């Protein structure tokens, strides 16, 4: 079991790392080419569209993965479920687009940017035909990885080649969603291999309505919880430059979160299968393994990014002087690499397979209220104090994330406490402290002027120090890898 999971984990991590590298190549170029105000406008409009993407999806992918993974070996049963979920998602997409149009034509500031918003909305309109959840349920991680890398590499090359100035905003917006369009075309072409398009009925929608509704509300609350900070900031800062600073500051954190949460695609089908089989031994082992990977990645990332905040944001922004507040925002939000990722894993790997989504919903309701209220309150305070509302919004988001994680640990304590609080976690913390000290010495003691060289040196030396310290401590992941190599 573990070897198969390890392969899937490695494939997903490689995919996410490559996609991250491609983002790092194109994003600084875009920041420098568009400028803070135009980039802030894009981020603000994209955040608005993202709300309706969530309505269009309505939590359907998560439920579809769970249900399709149960019948993955029966082509007709699988085809029936695929057709059912496609119809449900198509209806929700039409509803989402209608609501978005009402919003755009009702709010003056949104109407002024209607062309940009409608270009970005293509992303969720065409996503209806992606069937990505099917390939995840079938555990086609190698196919997903190759396809994603190829399409994003193509789009990144086009962005770097064609986006040159602030007037290229609409061109960039289209190129940013082009990878989704290409992914959909490839998925539809490959779909017939796994399912039939012939009618397989009668359809049974009723059994999905309650779980989809719960997961939809969860997705909506998660969006409010995650994206409202940017949206509120857009109203607090009319120039949108603070939104751009916030976007640059949070970019590297989002990369770490994406790296960890990409593993959901590996763990959800397996966790669902083990729980359905009532195999608590494998279920608990999978939970602990998932948490170990999360901590293994997040702890050293927090340590190194805290020490290299100026260098990281300078590279992400393309060296522009318009992003002066980005480093402090990164430092404030850096713990989200761990807190958000753990919260996501508790939901996806524990609560969702157990069909206890409602507990996550209650926690997110609390988080959304705290984040909205805190962002407005602290954002206005920092706006009046030093005209930096982004810092106030970042503090509110960071505190809310910690509260949400604590609540989820309490809710799922039967499966989470032992998997999270153990000797192995302590070993990872010790390794993280070693990385923190190493990063501090390289960042502030060794005289290196080039930001890229400093980051590469910190990552390389820090990685060696981290792995060696964990090997000496006999940390589970590192020690099991060493033993496997020595066999």
For the regions a language model picked out, list residue spans one by one.
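Membrane-proximal transmembrane or re-entrant/amphipathic helices at the cytosolic face
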Residues: 238, 419-424, 439-487
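Signature of the first transmembrane helix
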Residues: 3-62, 97, 101, 152, ...
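Interfacial segments at transmembrane-helix termini and the short loops linking adjacent helices
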Residues: 104-120, 240, 305-338, 342, ...
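N-terminal membrane topogenesis motif
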Residues: 1-23, 76, 202-218, 288, ...
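Helix-loop junctions and terminal segments of transmembrane helices
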Residues: 57-73, 253-291, 344-352
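Membrane-interface junctions at transmembrane-helix termini in multi-pass inner-membrane proteins
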Residues: 125-148, 335-366, 414
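Membrane-interface helix-loop junctions in multi-pass transport and translocation proteins
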Residues: 31-39, 109-111, 138-142, 146-184, ...
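Interhelical loop/hinge segments that connect adjacent transmembrane helices in multipass membrane
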Residues: 1-2, 145, 169-176, 185-227, ...
């Amino acid at each position: 079991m573990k070897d198969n999971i390890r392969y899937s984990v490695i494939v997903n991590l490689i995919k996410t790392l490559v996609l991250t590298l491609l983002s790092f190549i194109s994003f600084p170029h875009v920041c420098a080419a568009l400028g803070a105000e135009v980039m802030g406008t894009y981020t603000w409009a994209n955040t608005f569209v993202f709300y309706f993407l969530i309505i269009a999806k309505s939590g359907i992918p998560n439920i579809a993965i769970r249900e399709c993974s149960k019948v993955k070996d029966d082509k007709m049963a699988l085809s029936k479920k695929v057709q059912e979920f496609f119809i449900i998602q198509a209806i929700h997409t039409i509803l989402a687009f209608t609501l978005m149009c009402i919003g755009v034509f009702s709010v003056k500031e949104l109407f002024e940017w209607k062309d940009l918003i409608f270009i970005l909305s293509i992303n969720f309109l065409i996503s209806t035909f992606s069937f990505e959840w099917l390939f995840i349920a079938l555990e086609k991680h190698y196919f997903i990885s190759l396809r994603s890398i190829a399409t994003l590499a193509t789009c990144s090359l086009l962005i770097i080649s064609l986006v040159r100035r602030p007037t290229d905003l609409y061109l960039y917006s289209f190129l940013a969603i082009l990878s989704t369009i290409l992914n959909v075309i490839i998925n539809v072409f490959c779909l017939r291999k796994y399912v039939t398009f012939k009618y397989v009925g009668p359809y049974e929608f009723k059994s999905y309505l309650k779980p989809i509704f719960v997961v939809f509300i969860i997705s909506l609350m998660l969006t409010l919880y995650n994206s409202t900070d940017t949206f509120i900031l857009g109203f607090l800062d009319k120039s949108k430059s603070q939104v751009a600073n916030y976007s640059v500051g949070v970019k590297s954190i989002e990369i770490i979160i994406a790296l960890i949460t990409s593993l959901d695609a590996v763990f959800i089908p397996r966790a669902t299968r083990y729980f359905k089989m009532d195999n608590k031994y494998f279920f608990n082992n999978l939970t602990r393994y998932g948490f170990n990977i999360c901590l293994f990645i997040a702890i050293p990332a927090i340590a190194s990014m805290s020490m290299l905040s100026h260098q990281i944001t300078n590279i992400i922004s393309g060296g522009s002087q318009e992003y002066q507040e980005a480093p402090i925002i990164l430092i404030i939000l850096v713990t989200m690499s761990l807190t958000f990722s753990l919260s996501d894993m508790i939901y996806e790997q524990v609560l969702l397979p157990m069909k206890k989504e409602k507990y996550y919903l209650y926690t997110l309701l609390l988080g959304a209220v705290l984040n909205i209220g805190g962002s407005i309150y602290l954002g206005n305070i920092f706006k009046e104090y030093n005209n930096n509302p982004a810092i106030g919004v970042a503090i509110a988001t960071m505190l809310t994330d910690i509260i949400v994680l604590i609540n989820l640990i309490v809710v799922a304590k039967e499966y989470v406490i032992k998997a999270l609080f153990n000797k192995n976690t302590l070993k990872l913390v010790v390794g993280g402290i070693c990385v923190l000290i190493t990063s501090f010495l390289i960042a502030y003691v060794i005289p290196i002027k080039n930001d890229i060289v400093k980051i590469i040196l910190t990552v390389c030396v820090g990685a060696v120090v981290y792995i060696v310290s964990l090997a000496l401590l006999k940390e589970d992941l590192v020690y099991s890898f060493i033993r496997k190599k020595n066999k």
